[in-house]
Amino acid sequence: MTLDLHDYVASIQDFPEKGVTFRDISPLMENGEAYRQATNAIIKFARDKGVEMIVGPEARGFIVGCPVAYEMGIGFAPARKKGKLPRETVKATYGLEYGKSELYLQKDAIKPGQKVLITDDLLATGGTIAATIELVEKLGGIVVGTAFFIELKDLNGREKIKDYDTLSLMEY
């Protein structure tokens, strides 16, 4: 039976601030069949692309990417905030509404020429994912696609990653 994954996303009005509708994937993760269906769709996308490594940005990219990597029998590399990774890293800086942020990836996480899929729970403005792509490419990896549970179409995040094949399971 195919579930409508939209039924497993809670829409919270005025969170984290007035005028924002927060899309909460907790109900999806709390339902084994919905989580499995979403994960399996990304696994199929990854297999079709010959993916050899998954990279996900902190923290919800881990929730999406780890089960995909596990099921495929491949590795997962976390892109993390400053001070969270113990070995030598590369850095990418990206803009936020009020300032800048940084993501890091350990230098030995990606092999040159390795086919990489980047996963996250949600594509909004595209800044975090563009920074994650930059990290992978600095290390010589080939980003063969990006995959998300949710895409917020009005924020035009896909424009920042338009050169990459992108899978979004749900759009709002």
Curated annotation (Swiss-Prot):
Record's Pfam families?
Pribosyltran
* Leading EC class: transferase
Catalytic function, reaction form: AMP + diphosphate = 5-phospho-alpha-D-ribose 1-diphosphate + adenine
- Subunit comment: Homodimer.
- EC assignment: the record states 2.4.2.7
Biological process GO terms, please? adenine salvage; AMP salvage; purine ribonucleoside salvage
Q: Which gene encodes it?
A: apt
The entry's function note states: Catalyzes a salvage reaction resulting in the formation of AMP, that is energically less costly than de novo synthesis.
Q: Name one GO cellular component term.
A: cytoplasm
Q: Which InterPro entries match?
A: Ade_phspho_trans (IPR005764), PRibTrfase_dom (IPR000836), PRTase-like (IPR029057), UPRTase/APRTase (IPR050054)
CDD domains annotated for this entry?
PRTases_typeI
Q: Which family does it belong to?
A: Belongs to the purine/pyrimidine phosphoribosyltransferase family.
Is Cell membrane found in the keyword set? no
Q: What is this protein called?
A: Adenine phosphoribosyltransferase
Record's subcellular location: Cytoplasm
Predominant place of localization: cytoplasm
Q: Which UniProt keywords apply?
A: Cytoplasm, Glycosyltransferase, Purine salvage, Transferase
**Which pathway does it operate in?**
Purine metabolism; AMP biosynthesis via salvage pathway; AMP from adenine: step 1/1
Tell me which Gene3D superfamilies the record gives.
Answer: 3.40.50.2020
